[in-house]
């Protein structure tokens, strides 16, 4: 049953990630990977909410492990950061990587804080 719940959440999370990433990339003309950045930050924020919300085991598996596991994308984050470095956009790469980490941590803490209100 655990794998089924995680699989359902994961399928939904990957579809939502693809759609949001597609919408963002069509609306921005920047070389900066805004889609992945926004997805990862909102994913960290939502994970903060879920971890402190007192969600039961099954709901947590669907949302945290499944949905957010597929929604956020560390491999794409690394790929885009590396490509910025490789394409001689070192400052953009540095800003992207550091801001993703710092704002991601802040987003997680904000999510935890909001869930306790």
From Swiss-Prot:
Membrane topology category: Multi-pass membrane protein
Catalysis performed (reactions): fluoride(in) = fluoride(out)
Description of activity control: Na(+) is not transported, but it plays an essential structural role and its presence is essential for fluoride channel function.
TM spans (from-to): 4-24, 31-51, 59-79, 94-114
CC annotations in GO: plasma membrane
Main location: membrane
Positions contributing to Na(+) binding: 69, 72
BP-aspect Gene Ontology terms: cellular detoxification of fluoride
Source superkingdom: Bacteria
Function: Fluoride-specific ion channel. Important for reducing fluoride concentration in the cell, thus reducing its toxicity.
Record protein name field: Fluoride-specific ion channel FluC 2
Naturally occurring in which organism (per UniProt): Clostridium acetobutylicum (strain ATCC 824 / DSM 792 / JCM 1419 / IAM 19013 / LMG 5710 / NBRC 13948 / NRRL B-527 / VKM B-1787 / 2291 / W)
